[in-house]
Amino acid sequence: MTELVHTRADLAAARDGLTGTVGVVMTMGALHSGHETLLRAAREQADNVVVTIFVNPLQFGPDEDFDRYPRPLDEDLEICRRAGAAVVFAPAVPELYPQGQPRVWVNPGQLGEELEGQSRPGFFHGVLTVVLKLLQLTRPDRAFFGEKDYQQLTLVRRMVRDLEVPVEIVGVPTVREPDGLALSSRNRYLSPDGRTAALSLSGALQAGVAAAAGGADAGAVLAAAHAALDAGPPGVQLDYLVLTDPELEPGPVTGPARLLAAAWVGTTRLIDNVSVQLAPRY
C-alpha cells in the first residue's frame, strides 16, 4: 500500500513508520519508463522506497516551462503503486518554501556554472538546494538518480561528499526508446518532426562511441559526433557537445570519458550523454 502525503509533518510520521533501509527517488512527476527503472533499482536495493514528486520552481528560469510542465499526479501515483513505493511525498510549493524562496541556497561551485549551468544560470543552485532539503526530510540510506542528468548526478555526489550528508548516491543508467532517444518528461513536447530531429542527438553520441571503439583520440571522437549531427535532419540547434573525464573535468587523453550534448529542438531543450572509453596512446 502506497501512502500519499503532502506535508512535512505527514512525511515525518510516515518515515518514522518505516523499518529497514530506505531508498529515495526524487522526481518532478510526469513519470515515464526511465523513472520506473529508478524505482525498480531502489526497490531492489532498499527495503522501502520513498518517491518525491515536486516541480521545483527554483530550477526554472524566467523564460522556461514551469507553468506548462506536466503534472499528472494520478498517473504518477499509479506508477509508484505498481513499483511498490511505500510513500509518495507530493508537496505544494509553499510547503517547501513557506517564504516564497529559501534564504540559504546551496552553491554548486564552478561546475555548476558550466554546461547546463552556463545555459541556465542559477539552475544547479535550485537543484542542489531542493535535493539537500529532500534528503533531510526523507532521511534515506540511498538516493537514486538517473545518469541522463549526468551533471546533476555529479554535483549531487560532490555535495553529499563535501557536506558530509550520510547517504549513498546511486547512479542508474539512462533508459532509451528502441530508436535510441533518451527518455525525458520533455519528450512529450516534441512534434513528430521534432522527435525525428531529436534522434540526431543520440546518434551523434553513438557516433562518438563508435569512433572511440575504433581507436580514435579525443579530437576525432568529437569530430565524429559533430559530423553525425551535421548529417542528421534539420531542426536541431546545438548548445554544447563536449568530452570530459567521468568527473566532468577537462577531457582525458586516454581511458574513461564522458561525451555530453545539449540541444534545442524547436522550443524543447534536450540533454544526453554516454560513457566513452578512449584507447591508450602509444
Curated annotation (Swiss-Prot):
EC numbers, comma separated: 6.3.2.1
InterPro entries (UniProt xref): Cyt_trans-like, Pantoate_ligase, Pantoate_ligase_C, Rossmann-like_a/b/a_fold
Function: Catalyzes the condensation of pantoate with beta-alanine in an ATP-dependent reaction via a pantoyl-adenylate intermediate.
GO terms under biological process: pantothenate biosynthetic process
Compartment annotation: Cytoplasm
Protein name: Pantothenate synthetase
Positions contributing to (R)-pantoate binding: 59, 152
Subunit structure: Homodimer.
HAMAP family in UniProt: PanC (MF_00158)
Keyword list, A-Z: ATP-binding, Cytoplasm, Ligase, Nucleotide-binding, Pantothenate biosynthesis
Pfam families cross-referenced by the UniProt entry: Pantoate_ligase
Annotated beta-alanine binding sites: 59
UniProt catalytic activity: (R)-pantoate + beta-alanine + ATP = (R)-pantothenate + AMP + diphosphate + H(+)
PANTHER family cross-referenced by the UniProt entry: CYTIDYLATE KINASE/PANTOATE-BETA-ALANINE LIGASE (PTHR21299), PANTOATE--BETA-ALANINE LIGASE (PTHR21299:SF1)
GO cellular-component term (any): cytosol
Binding site for ATP: 28-35, 146-149, 175, 183-186
Main location: cytoplasm
Active site: 35 (proton donor)
GO MF terms, alphabetically ordered: ATP binding; pantoate-beta-alanine ligase activity
Pathway: Cofactor biosynthesis; (R)-pantothenate biosynthesis; (R)-pantothenate from (R)-pantoate and beta-alanine: step 1/1
Gene3D superfamilies to which the protein is assigned, alphabetical: HUPs, Pantoate-beta-alanine ligase, C-terminal domain
Name of the top EC class for this enzyme: ligase
